[in-house]
């Protein structure tokens, strides 16, 4: 995947606002030292890494009783 777009991520997460929250939470985890779940040879910024992880289906979220 050369470029990641919002449309790629919206195939996995239906709501744009939820996508922003999910991505920002993952970026915070990456800044604190979490390892990327995808190959990051290009030394991409954490925001790009989080969006690529979402587009690849490596991370997601659950809404409702299961997600709490």
UniProtKB/Swiss-Prot annotation:
Promotes RNA polymerase assembly. Latches the N- and C-terminal regions of the beta' subunit thereby facilitating its interaction with the beta and alpha subunits. Its EC number is 2.7.7.6. This is DNA-directed RNA polymerase subunit omega. NCBIfam families: rpoZ (TIGR00690). The keyword Transferase applies. It catalyses: RNA(n) + a ribonucleoside 5'-triphosphate = RNA(n+1) + diphosphate. It holds the Pfam family RNA_pol_Rpb6. InterPro entries: DNA-dir_RNA_pol_omega (IPR003716), Pol_omega/Rpo6/RPB6 (IPR006110), RPB6/omega-like_sf (IPR036161). Keywords: DNA-directed RNA polymerase, Nucleotidyltransferase, Transcription, Transferase. The RNAP catalytic core consists of 2 alpha, 1 beta, 1 beta' and 1 omega subunit. When a sigma factor is associated with the core the holoenzyme is formed, which can initiate transcription. One of its GO terms (molecular function) is DNA-directed RNA polymerase activity. GO terms for biological process: DNA-templated transcription. PANTHER family: DNA-DIRECTED RNA POLYMERASE SUBUNIT OMEGA (PTHR34476:SF1). One of its GO terms (cellular component) is DNA-directed RNA polymerase complex. Belongs to the RNA polymerase subunit omega family. The keyword Transferase applies. HAMAP family: RNApol_bact_RpoZ. It comes from Geobacter sp. (strain M21).
